[in-house]
Protein backbone atom coordinates (compact mmCIF):
# COMPACT_ATOMS: atom_id res chain seq x y z
CA UNK A 1 0.00 0.00 0.00
CA UNK A 2 2.93 2.32 0.39
CA UNK A 3 6.01 3.59 -1.35
CA UNK A 4 7.99 3.31 1.86
CA UNK A 5 11.10 2.13 0.18
CA UNK A 6 12.70 -1.14 1.14
CA UNK A 7 14.88 0.55 3.72
CA UNK A 8 11.88 1.14 6.00
CA UNK A 9 10.70 -2.45 6.09
CA UNK A 10 13.97 -4.35 5.84
CA UNK A 11 15.43 -5.26 9.25
CA UNK A 12 18.72 -3.53 9.94
CA UNK A 13 19.98 -6.32 12.21
CA UNK A 14 18.93 -9.34 14.21
CA UNK A 15 18.26 -7.14 17.24
CA UNK A 16 14.66 -7.04 18.45
CA UNK A 17 13.11 -3.77 19.59
CA UNK A 18 10.38 -5.07 21.89
CA UNK A 19 9.41 -1.75 23.48
CA UNK A 20 9.19 0.14 20.19
CA UNK A 21 7.17 -2.63 18.57
CA UNK A 22 4.83 -3.00 21.57
CA UNK A 23 4.29 0.76 21.96
CA UNK A 24 3.64 1.21 18.23
CA UNK A 25 1.31 -1.80 18.14
CA UNK A 26 -0.72 -0.65 21.15
CA UNK A 27 -0.97 2.93 19.90
CA UNK A 28 -2.46 1.79 16.61
CA UNK A 29 -4.53 -0.95 18.26
CA UNK A 30 -6.27 1.46 20.64
CA UNK A 31 -7.48 3.55 17.70
CA UNK A 32 -9.64 0.65 16.49
CA UNK A 33 -12.13 0.55 19.40
CA UNK A 34 -11.82 4.29 20.00
CA UNK A 35 -12.78 5.03 16.39
CA UNK A 36 -15.90 2.87 16.69
CA UNK A 37 -16.78 4.45 20.04
CA UNK A 38 -16.31 7.99 18.70
CA UNK A 39 -18.77 7.39 15.87
CA UNK A 40 -21.39 5.98 18.24
CA UNK A 41 -20.98 8.80 20.78
CA UNK A 42 -21.31 11.43 18.03
CA UNK A 43 -24.47 9.75 16.72
CA UNK A 44 -26.06 9.80 20.16
CA UNK A 45 -24.85 13.24 21.24
CA UNK A 46 -25.68 15.24 18.10
CA UNK A 47 -28.73 15.86 16.02
CA UNK A 48 -28.62 14.77 12.40
CA UNK A 49 -27.62 18.12 10.93
CA UNK A 50 -24.87 18.78 13.46
CA UNK A 51 -23.58 15.24 13.00
CA UNK A 52 -23.16 15.59 9.25
CA UNK A 53 -21.44 18.98 9.49
CA UNK A 54 -19.15 17.73 12.27
CA UNK A 55 -18.25 14.60 10.34
CA UNK A 56 -17.43 16.60 7.22
CA UNK A 57 -15.31 18.98 9.28
CA UNK A 58 -13.55 15.97 10.81
CA UNK A 59 -12.61 14.67 7.37
CA UNK A 60 -11.36 18.11 6.33
CA UNK A 61 -9.28 18.37 9.50
CA UNK A 62 -7.78 14.98 8.73
CA UNK A 63 -6.79 16.07 5.23
CA UNK A 64 -5.19 19.25 6.60
CA UNK A 65 -3.22 17.19 9.14
CA UNK A 66 -1.92 14.88 6.41
CA UNK A 67 -0.83 17.87 4.31
CA UNK A 68 0.77 19.49 7.37
CA UNK A 69 2.75 16.29 7.82
CA UNK A 70 4.38 16.84 4.42
CA UNK A 71 6.00 19.99 5.84
CA UNK A 72 6.85 18.50 9.24
CA UNK A 73 10.46 17.69 10.09
CA UNK A 74 11.43 14.17 11.10
CA UNK A 75 10.25 10.73 10.05
CA UNK A 76 8.33 10.01 13.27
CA UNK A 77 6.49 13.33 13.25
CA UNK A 78 5.51 12.91 9.62
CA UNK A 79 4.29 9.39 10.35
CA UNK A 80 2.13 10.58 13.27
CA UNK A 81 0.64 13.41 11.21
CA UNK A 82 -0.21 11.00 8.41
CA UNK A 83 -1.60 8.37 10.77
CA UNK A 84 -3.87 10.56 12.88
CA UNK A 85 -4.89 12.65 9.89
CA UNK A 86 -5.74 9.46 8.04
CA UNK A 87 -7.91 8.24 10.90
CA UNK A 88 -9.93 11.48 10.91
CA UNK A 89 -10.14 11.43 7.10
CA UNK A 90 -11.40 7.83 7.08
CA UNK A 91 -13.94 8.41 9.84
CA UNK A 92 -15.24 11.75 8.57
CA UNK A 93 -15.09 11.46 4.79
CA UNK A 94 -15.50 7.72 4.31
CA UNK A 95 -17.50 6.08 7.09
CA UNK A 96 -19.74 9.04 7.91
CA UNK A 97 -20.35 9.83 4.23
CA UNK A 98 -21.35 6.23 3.57
CA UNK A 99 -23.64 6.54 6.60
CA UNK A 100 -25.16 9.78 5.31
CA UNK A 101 -26.03 8.42 1.86
CA UNK A 102 -27.14 5.03 3.20
CA UNK A 103 -29.58 6.78 5.54
CA UNK A 104 -30.63 9.38 2.98
CA UNK A 105 -31.67 6.76 0.43
CA UNK A 106 -33.22 4.35 2.90
CA UNK A 107 -30.72 1.50 3.05
CA UNK A 108 -31.90 -0.87 5.76
CA UNK A 109 -29.52 -2.48 8.28
CA UNK A 110 -29.05 -6.24 8.38
CA UNK A 111 -30.88 -7.67 11.39
CA UNK A 112 -30.35 -10.84 13.39
CA UNK A 113 -33.32 -13.06 12.43
CA UNK A 114 -33.65 -14.33 16.01
CA UNK A 115 -33.02 -11.30 18.23
CA UNK A 116 -33.85 -8.53 15.77
CA UNK A 117 -30.63 -6.71 16.72
CA UNK A 118 -28.60 -4.86 14.10
CA UNK A 119 -25.66 -6.99 12.96
CA UNK A 120 -24.51 -4.84 10.03
CA UNK A 121 -25.13 -1.12 9.77
CA UNK A 122 -26.39 0.33 6.45
CA UNK A 123 -23.15 2.16 5.60
CA UNK A 124 -21.16 -1.07 5.71
CA UNK A 125 -23.72 -2.92 3.58
CA UNK A 126 -23.10 -0.52 0.68
CA UNK A 127 -19.33 -0.27 1.15
CA UNK A 128 -18.58 -3.32 -1.09
CA UNK A 129 -19.84 -1.20 -4.00
CA UNK A 130 -16.52 0.67 -3.73
CA UNK A 131 -14.50 -2.46 -4.60
CA UNK A 132 -13.82 -1.20 -8.13
CA UNK A 133 -12.33 2.02 -6.79
CA UNK A 134 -10.08 0.05 -4.41
CA UNK A 135 -8.89 -2.09 -7.32
CA UNK A 136 -8.28 1.03 -9.39
CA UNK A 137 -5.83 2.35 -6.79
CA UNK A 138 -4.23 -1.08 -6.41
CA UNK A 139 -3.61 -1.27 -10.18
CA UNK A 140 -1.76 2.02 -10.00
CA UNK A 141 0.43 0.79 -7.12
CA UNK A 142 1.15 -2.62 -8.66
CA UNK A 143 1.99 -1.47 -12.19
CA UNK A 144 3.35 2.04 -11.65
CA UNK A 145 5.30 2.14 -8.38
CA UNK A 146 8.43 0.61 -6.98
CA UNK A 147 7.85 0.45 -3.23
CA UNK A 148 8.57 -1.40 0.00
CA UNK A 149 5.12 -2.87 0.67
CA UNK A 150 5.44 -6.65 1.01
CA UNK A 151 1.86 -7.23 -0.17
CA UNK A 152 2.31 -5.19 -3.35
CA UNK A 153 5.76 -6.66 -3.99
CA UNK A 154 4.28 -10.17 -3.73
CA UNK A 155 1.75 -9.37 -6.45
CA UNK A 156 4.35 -7.60 -8.57
CA UNK A 157 6.61 -10.66 -8.51
CA UNK A 158 3.75 -12.88 -9.67
CA UNK A 159 2.18 -10.56 -12.24
CA UNK A 160 5.20 -8.72 -13.62
CA UNK A 161 7.69 -11.57 -13.06
CA UNK A 162 11.12 -10.87 -14.56
CA UNK A 163 9.91 -7.51 -15.94
CA UNK A 164 9.16 -6.09 -12.49
CA UNK A 165 12.10 -3.67 -12.48
CA UNK A 166 11.27 -2.56 -16.01
CA UNK A 167 7.51 -2.00 -15.58
CA UNK A 168 7.50 -0.68 -11.99
CA UNK A 169 10.82 1.11 -12.36
CA UNK A 170 10.53 4.13 -10.07
CA UNK A 171 8.90 5.07 -6.76
CA UNK A 172 6.57 8.01 -6.32
CA UNK A 173 7.83 11.21 -4.77
CA UNK A 174 8.15 10.13 -1.18
CA UNK A 175 6.40 12.09 1.57
CA UNK A 176 6.21 10.00 4.75
CA UNK A 177 2.93 11.59 5.83
CA UNK A 178 1.28 10.69 2.51
CA UNK A 179 2.82 7.21 2.59
CA UNK A 180 1.37 6.59 6.06
CA UNK A 181 -1.99 8.06 5.08
CA UNK A 182 -2.32 5.90 1.96
CA UNK A 183 -1.16 2.78 3.79
CA UNK A 184 -3.79 3.29 6.49
CA UNK A 185 -6.63 4.08 4.07
CA UNK A 186 -5.90 1.22 1.67
CA UNK A 187 -5.47 -1.40 4.41
CA UNK A 188 -8.58 -0.28 6.31
CA UNK A 189 -10.57 -0.14 3.09
CA UNK A 190 -9.34 -3.56 1.97
CA UNK A 191 -10.10 -5.16 5.33
CA UNK A 192 -13.66 -3.78 5.34
CA UNK A 193 -14.22 -5.08 1.81
CA UNK A 194 -12.88 -8.50 2.78
CA UNK A 195 -15.13 -8.70 5.84
CA UNK A 196 -18.25 -7.48 4.04
CA UNK A 197 -17.83 -10.00 1.22
CA UNK A 198 -17.26 -12.76 3.79
CA UNK A 199 -20.35 -11.75 5.80
CA UNK A 200 -22.59 -11.58 2.71
CA UNK A 201 -24.74 -14.72 2.54
CA UNK A 202 -24.75 -14.44 -1.25
CA UNK A 203 -21.00 -15.06 -1.16
CA UNK A 204 -20.09 -16.89 2.05
CA UNK A 205 -21.82 -15.85 5.29
CA UNK A 206 -20.44 -14.97 8.71
CA UNK A 207 -20.40 -18.61 9.90
CA UNK A 208 -19.02 -20.07 6.67
CA UNK A 209 -15.82 -22.16 7.05
CA UNK A 210 -13.99 -19.88 4.61
CA UNK A 211 -14.85 -16.86 6.76
CA UNK A 212 -13.42 -18.66 9.78
CA UNK A 213 -10.30 -19.56 7.77
CA UNK A 214 -9.92 -15.90 6.76
CA UNK A 215 -9.99 -14.93 10.43
CA UNK A 216 -7.51 -17.64 11.37
CA UNK A 217 -5.22 -16.75 8.47
CA UNK A 218 -5.22 -13.08 9.44
CA UNK A 219 -4.51 -13.93 13.08
CA UNK A 220 -1.51 -16.07 12.12
CA UNK A 221 -0.39 -13.50 9.56
CA UNK A 222 -0.42 -10.72 12.15
CA UNK A 223 2.17 -12.60 14.22
CA UNK A 224 4.47 -12.88 11.19
CA UNK A 225 4.10 -9.16 10.50
CA UNK A 226 4.81 -8.37 14.15
CA UNK A 227 7.95 -10.53 13.95
CA UNK A 228 9.19 -8.24 11.15
CA UNK A 229 8.14 -5.18 13.11
CA UNK A 230 10.26 -6.30 16.07
CA UNK A 231 13.42 -5.82 14.00
CA UNK A 232 12.70 -2.24 12.89
CA UNK A 233 14.80 0.26 14.84
CA UNK A 234 13.17 3.50 13.62
CA UNK A 235 10.08 4.75 15.47
CA UNK A 236 8.46 6.04 12.28
CA UNK A 237 8.92 2.84 10.28
CA UNK A 238 7.85 0.78 13.30
CA UNK A 239 4.58 2.70 13.57
CA UNK A 240 3.95 2.28 9.84
CA UNK A 241 4.49 -1.47 10.10
CA UNK A 242 2.21 -1.52 13.17
CA UNK A 243 -0.65 -0.24 11.00
CA UNK A 244 -0.50 -3.41 8.92
CA UNK A 245 -0.01 -5.59 12.01
CA UNK A 246 -3.02 -4.14 13.82
CA UNK A 247 -5.48 -4.06 10.90
CA UNK A 248 -4.67 -7.68 10.00
CA UNK A 249 -4.93 -8.63 13.70
CA UNK A 250 -8.23 -6.76 14.05
CA UNK A 251 -9.87 -8.78 11.26
CA UNK A 252 -10.35 -11.94 13.42
CA UNK A 253 -11.44 -9.67 16.30
CA UNK A 254 -14.25 -8.35 14.10
CA UNK A 255 -15.20 -11.88 13.02
CA UNK A 256 -15.28 -13.16 16.61
CA UNK A 257 -17.37 -10.16 17.64
CA UNK A 258 -19.74 -10.87 14.77
CA UNK A 259 -20.16 -14.42 16.12
CA UNK A 260 -20.86 -13.04 19.63
CA UNK A 261 -17.83 -14.80 21.10
CA UNK A 262 -17.12 -11.77 23.30
CA UNK A 263 -18.72 -8.48 24.29
CA UNK A 264 -17.61 -5.58 22.07
CA UNK A 265 -17.50 -2.78 24.63
CA UNK A 266 -16.71 -0.16 21.96
CA UNK A 267 -20.15 -0.51 20.32
CA UNK A 268 -21.77 0.54 23.61
CA UNK A 269 -19.18 2.95 25.08
CA UNK A 270 -21.62 4.70 27.41
CA UNK A 271 -22.33 1.38 29.11
CA UNK A 272 -18.62 0.69 29.61
CA UNK A 273 -17.30 4.08 30.68
CA UNK A 274 -14.62 2.70 33.00
CA UNK A 275 -13.16 0.31 30.43
CA UNK A 276 -13.23 2.91 27.65
CA UNK A 277 -11.72 5.48 30.02
CA UNK A 278 -8.79 3.15 30.66
CA UNK A 279 -8.29 2.69 26.91
CA UNK A 280 -8.38 6.48 26.36
CA UNK A 281 -5.88 7.09 29.17
CA UNK A 282 -3.49 4.42 27.90
CA UNK A 283 -3.80 5.71 24.34
CA UNK A 284 -3.15 9.32 25.43
CA UNK A 285 -0.08 8.25 27.42
CA UNK A 286 1.35 6.39 24.42
CA UNK A 287 0.71 9.30 22.05
CA UNK A 288 2.41 11.73 24.44
CA UNK A 289 5.36 9.35 24.70
CA UNK A 290 5.65 9.01 20.92
CA UNK A 291 5.49 12.77 20.43
CA UNK A 292 8.18 13.22 23.09
CA UNK A 293 10.32 10.57 21.38
CA UNK A 294 9.94 12.39 18.06
CA UNK A 295 10.93 15.71 19.65
CA UNK A 296 13.92 14.10 21.37
CA UNK A 297 15.08 12.55 18.11
CA UNK A 298 14.75 15.89 16.32
CA UNK A 299 16.91 17.61 18.96
CA UNK A 300 19.49 14.84 18.72
CA UNK A 301 19.73 15.35 14.96
CA UNK A 302 20.32 19.08 15.40
Regions found by a protein language model. Give the residues of each.
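Long, contiguous internal "core" modules enriched in hydrophobic/ aromatic residues
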Residues: 121-126, 138-237
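Loop-to-helix transition at the N-terminal end of transmembrane alpha-helices
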Residues: 46-62, 80, 206-214
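Short, hydrophobic transmembrane alpha-helix segments
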Residues: 38-50, 69-75, 199-202
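N-terminal signal-anchor module of multipass membrane proteins
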Residues: 2-49
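Central hydrophobic cores of alpha-helical transmembrane segments in multi-pass inner-membrane proteins
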Residues: 32-36, 57-71
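Hydrophobic alpha-helical transmembrane segments in multi-pass integral membrane proteins
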Residues: 248-266
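Membrane-interface helix-loop-helix junctions at boundaries between adjacent transmembrane segments
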Residues: 72-169
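Small-residue-rich transmembrane alpha-helices that serve as helix-helix interface/gating elements
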Residues: 215-216, 268-288
Amino acid sequence: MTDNGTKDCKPASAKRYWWKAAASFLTVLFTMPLGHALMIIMEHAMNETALHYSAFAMGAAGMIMVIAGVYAKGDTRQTLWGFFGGLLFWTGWVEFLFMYYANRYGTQPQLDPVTGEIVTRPEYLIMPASFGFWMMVMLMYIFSTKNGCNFINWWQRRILRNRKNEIAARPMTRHTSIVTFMELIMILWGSYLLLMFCYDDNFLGDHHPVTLLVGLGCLIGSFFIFAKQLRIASWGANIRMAIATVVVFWTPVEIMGRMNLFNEIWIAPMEHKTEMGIVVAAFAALVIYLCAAARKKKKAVH
